[in-house]
Amino acid sequence: MAVHFYDAAYDLEKALRNSDEYSRLRGLYDQVNADESAKRMFDNFRNVQLQLQQKQMSGEEITQEEVEQAQKTVALVQQHELISQLMEAEQRMSMLIGELNKIIMKPLEELYGSQQ
């Protein structure tokens, strides 16, 4: 029976890869990487994002200075049209995956009762 779950998961992965949402995300990501200035800006944004996430996950406090720097970085990348479109596409893909996760978790929520 477990093999069936993996087959379904791989089918879902294939469906995501073939979706319009993923195609748009991939296309925008490729465009950002092809533009040297946009790539540098986006890589810097991702590094700031990852550093803050790592600090948060390790229980370290994020300083006000780091918060302000992150806000400046976000404001800067949002001004770049291509990066802004990429971030919107990432958000749509993340929402789609979140909705799929809710569907997958539904049996456990029904079993244990929803906390929402």
Swiss-Prot record:
Q: Which InterPro entries match?
A: Com_YlbF, YheA/YmcA-like_dom_sf
Q: Which Gene3D superfamilies match?
A: YheA/YmcA-like (1.20.1500.10)
Give each disulfide bond as a residue pair: none
Lineage: superkingdom: Bacteria
Coiled coil where? none
Q: Record's family?
A: Belongs to the UPF0342 family.
The entry's protein name is UPF0342 protein RBAM_010030
Q: Which organism is it from?
A: Bacillus velezensis (strain DSM 23117 / BGSC 10A6 / LMG 26770 / FZB42)
